[in-house]
From Swiss-Prot:
Subunit structure: Tetramer of two alpha and two beta chains.
Protein name: Tryptophan synthase alpha chain
Taxonomic path: Bacteria, Pseudomonadati, Pseudomonadota, Gammaproteobacteria, Pseudomonadales
Source organism, top-level taxon: Bacteria
Keyword Secreted tagged: no
Organism: Stutzerimonas stutzeri (strain A1501)
Gene (name only): trpA
């Protein structure tokens, strides 16, 4: 069983949702980012999404766009992002890591080489936001053949006709974007999320993780009662952006992660 499915299985037995945390690789620099990455599991992260920096992250809001700019300024690239995963795996063999980003850097590296290196580094899943299911053969199919899950985004505008197409070939989990638009935007109403999760569950047996707009332990707890996973990204990235030093960035991210984790873990208690 994959690391992702194993983790969701464990959490189901514990009757709690996963806390899925997002950071951008190399933000604000390689060493600090690696320190944050290595600290996230102990701070309560159950699954980690690691952003692959790209020059044109059009699906992301201002916070993550700025994180991409900081990481690229610090000379982060896809090879270094894979190296970060290798270094993380020296200490942690159980926490799933999902690389999230855009197809261009993968295409430039070469799909075959990228998949081989991702497997060797210990990557568990991919979210590639600009690669629709009509292009499964470009990356989804070969990635899954190599044992890497391919996770799809669904949104409030994904209708019942489109949903089976989007879910075709999905594995690992389904990422529900609770607010149509860019990441980090406002938060959705709980009723809306509950209805959306129920609709997804009619189409898939995969765990559903809900993200976008979750910034507090209370919001995370409310979502954790409704679904298998809570995704937090922009709120963590803001801790890096607002920090006066790299040490403060590390502590800010990990402390917020601890607080949100407490909310998620107490949600169904």
């Amino acid at each position: 069983m994959s690391r992702l499915l194993t983790r969701f299985d464990e959490l189901k037995q514990q009757n709690r949702a996963a806390l899925v945390t997002f950071i951008t690789a190399g933000d604000p620099d390689y060493a600090t980012s690696l320190q944050i990455l290595k600290g996230l599991p102990a701070a309560g992260a159950d699954v980690i999404e690691l952003g692959m920096p790209f020059t044109d992250p059009m699906a992301d809001g201002p916070a993550i766009q700025l994180a991409n700019i900081r990481a690229l300024a610090a000379k982060q690239d896809l090879a270094k992002t894979l190296q970060m995963v290798r270094e993380f795996r020296q200490d942690d063999q159980t926490t799933p890591i999902v690389l999230m980003g855009y197809f261009n850097p993968i295409h430039k590296m070469g799909v075959e080489r990228f998949i081989a290196e991702a497997v060797e580094a210990g990557v568990d899943g991919l979210i590639v936001v600009d690669l629709p299911p009509e292009h499964n053969e470009d990356l989804c199919d070969p990635a899954q053949a190599a044992g890497i899950d391919f996770i799809r985004l669904t949104t409030p505008t994904t209708d019942d006709k489109r949903l089976p197409v989007v879910l075709n070939g999905s594995s690992g989990f389904v990422y529900y974007v609770s607010v149509a638009g860019v990441t980090g935007a406002g938060s959705a109403t709980l009723e809306h999320v509950e209805e959306a999760v129920a609709r997804l569950k009619r189409h898939t047996e995969l765990p559903v993780c809900v993200g976008f707009g979750i910034r507090t332990p209370e919001q995370a707890a409310a979502i954790a009662r409704l679904t298998e996973g809570v995704v937090v990204g922009s709120a963590l990235i803001d801790q890096i952006a607002n920090a006066k030093s790299n040490a403060q960035a590390v502590e800010g991210v990990l402390e917020l992660c601890r607080q949100i984790s407490t909310g998620v873990r107490s949600a169904r208690a």
